[in-house]
Amino acid sequence: SDDNDVAAEMMSGLIALAIDSCCSDSDCNANHPDMCS
């Protein structure tokens, strides 16, 4: 279960990075307004 926790933390970290890079891109931000507040 520890391995699963680490994998989940890594995934959420990668998702957060992807969302940040998306929200700093005007086209991606416009396509995903629900992710970018």
Swiss-Prot record:
Tissue: Expressed by the venom duct.
Cross-referenced Pfam families: Toxin_8
Chain residue ranges for the region called Lacks the Ser-Xaa-Pro motif that is crucial for potent interaction with nAChR: 24-26
Top-level taxon of the source organism: Eukaryota
GO CC terms: extracellular region; host cell postsynaptic membrane
UniProt propeptide residues: 1-21
Localisation per UniProt entry: Secreted
Function summary: Alpha-conotoxins act on postsynaptic membranes, they bind to the nicotinic acetylcholine receptors (nAChR) and thus inhibit them. Has possibly a distinct nAChR binding mode from other alpha-conotoxins, due to a different three residue motif (lacks the Ser-Xaa-Pro motif).
UniProt-recorded name of the protein: Alpha-conotoxin-like Lp1.9
Protein species of origin: Conus leopardus
Classification lineage: Eukaryota, Metazoa, Spiralia, Lophotrochozoa, Mollusca
